[in-house]
Amino acid sequence: MAIQYKRILLKVSGEALSGPKGTGFDEETIASICAGIKAAHDLGAQIGIVVGGGNFWRGRSSGKMDRMDADKIGMLATVMNALAVKDALRQQGVEAVVMTSSLMPQVAECFTSDKAIAALESGKIVVFGGGTGNPIFSTDTASALRALEISADAMFKATMVDGVYDKDPHKYADAVRYDTLTFTRVLDERLAVMDSTAATLCRDNGLPILVFDLGKPENIAKAVQGEMVGTLVKE
């Protein structure tokens, strides 16, 4: 079956891995998400994944803690999530490897673009942990960076809503969903797609983003085939 996006970077929030529990891991939820990833992989897509850490830690809500230390804790949380996703994929018969932004030789391989691309081309899914390896930068920015480093055709941002809206659809019944947007409009209107650093990276390097609902894991395979399952952002 023909696919539109041969190589993708999938961003999955940490909160998505917690399922109805709201914190930590929910094995059933992770298994469901990974089944959706496997379906896209079975179509022939090469898949890199960046996971957030919000199911364990949110640096911006860390009170009086030093921001640098808080962000480092958050980066470690993403490594835990990356290992959980890798294990869930392997349970479903998919070869996967974790690559981290900082040296953790007893935990995972350290990321280089060459090693990541080689793993993708060999049929493995690569799960990236540790964010960018630097404090301040979000996992959205890490996703944009890794997508560019592996020469992805698109970045898929799997969220808890079915696209980008003009206002919060959970609060406003008259919220309007966009089918397509430009990065310039996203930045000018501060629409809730991702932070401005990540959006600017994608805009300046011609990397499209598809935002869709991870509550329907089958959307990943549909999106790989070019179906409009959410909001497409490109310049």
Predicted regions mapped to residue ranges:
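C-terminal catalytic "cap/lid" subdomain
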Residues: 1-235
